[in-house]
Amino acid sequence: MTAAPLKVAFAGTPEFAAAALEAILAAGFEVPLVLTQPDRPAGRGMKLSPSPVKQLALAHGIAVDQPSSLRGEEQRATLAACAPDVLVVAAYGLILPRAVLDLPRFGCLNIHASLLPRWRGAAPIHRAIEAGDTETGITIMQMDEGLDTGPMLMKHAVPIGPADTTGALHDRLAALGAQMIVEALRRLPSGELVAMPQPAEGATYAGKIGKAEAVIDWQCDASSVARAVRAFNPFPGAVASLRQVPLKIWFAEPVAGHGEPGTVLVADADGIVVACGTQAVRLAQLQKPGSRRLAAGEFLRGFPVSAGERFEAAAR
């Protein structure tokens, strides 16, 4: 006799999590409850907007709870009432107390976008690109009370290409995470998934991205600047100010060149070449306030730039 599919409660908020929820539903698992962050102001009108996970859950007729904390008895009772076999967590944004971790029969599984223990924390994709890592991946882990410190059940690596942005890598990892969590849920009841403790060495922390750190520091070497531009694409977008106008930089590549950091060396249809602490970068896609992203040639027609001009230094 075939065992009934697991009853899976789900906790997540952004698109990364929605991909996993969609895969879980498509695989036929019963999802009695979805937890997601409260609606947040978004868009030009700053109207309250539901998370991608909430939108997906409502479209499937699934009950949604949006607590600001899981530490209260009422929130735990809501989860307990649906009697889940397992709680799947993906980019949820709230801390799970011990009482919640212990509630499901098979505990809580987390989909984390790095090869743990490297890049524990809120922004593993950004930080992997920014640091120049050549690979990252997905780890499915059994959650404990620490920050991404629980034992690992599954792990799969993917390469980081030289042109990968956080946006592109996010989409690949979201698809991989969705595939892996379905496999994990299918294998979980049999006990064949072996929980491996994370290594004591190699742990790093992927701190939340602040808009201030997206300001380009021209004193850095060209490779670091180019990686930062890729890491902060699409959020929050790397920023550099010229003539006191904040410009978003969406694509940059290291090139030969030298000069005072921040100085424009060349400005033509191929791009704006700017000196860095070591070598230079070519800015090939830019955006001024109130406009759209433009290739360098088109950008320069509306915002002329000359060799010798200098971008403002990043605040220290």
From Swiss-Prot:
Please give the SUPFAM superfamilies that the UniProt record associates with this protein.
FMT C-terminal domain-like, Formyltransferase
Describe the reaction catalysed, as an equation: L-methionyl-tRNA(fMet) + (6R)-10-formyltetrahydrofolate = N-formyl-L-methionyl-tRNA(fMet) + (6S)-5,6,7,8-tetrahydrofolate + H(+)
GO MF annotation, one: methionyl-tRNA formyltransferase activity
Task: List cellular component terms (GO).
Answer: cytosol
Tell me the keywords, alphabetical order: Protein biosynthesis, Transferase
EC no. given is 2.1.2.9
Entry binding sites for (6S)-5,6,7,8-tetrahydrofolate: S114, L115, L116, P117
User: Which InterPro entries does the UniProt record give?
Assistant: Fmt (IPR005794), Formyl_trans_C (IPR005793), Formyl_trans_C_sf (IPR037022), Formyl_transf_N (IPR002376), Formyl_transf_N_sf (IPR036477), Formyl_transferase-like_C_sf (IPR011034), GART_AS (IPR001555), Met-tRNA-FMT_C (IPR044135)
Q: What's the top EC group for this one? A: transferase
Q: Which HAMAP family match?
A: Formyl_trans
What this protein is reported to do is described as: Attaches a formyl group to the free amino group of methionyl-tRNA(fMet). The formyl group appears to play a dual role in the initiator identity of N-formylmethionyl-tRNA by promoting its recognition by IF2 and preventing the misappropriation of this tRNA by the elongation apparatus.
| Family assignment from sequence similarity | Belongs to the Fmt family.
NCBIfam families, per the entry: fmt
- Name of the protein described by the UniProt record: Methionyl-tRNA formyltransferase
Species for this entry: Aromatoleum aromaticum (strain DSM 19018 / LMG 30748 / EbN1)
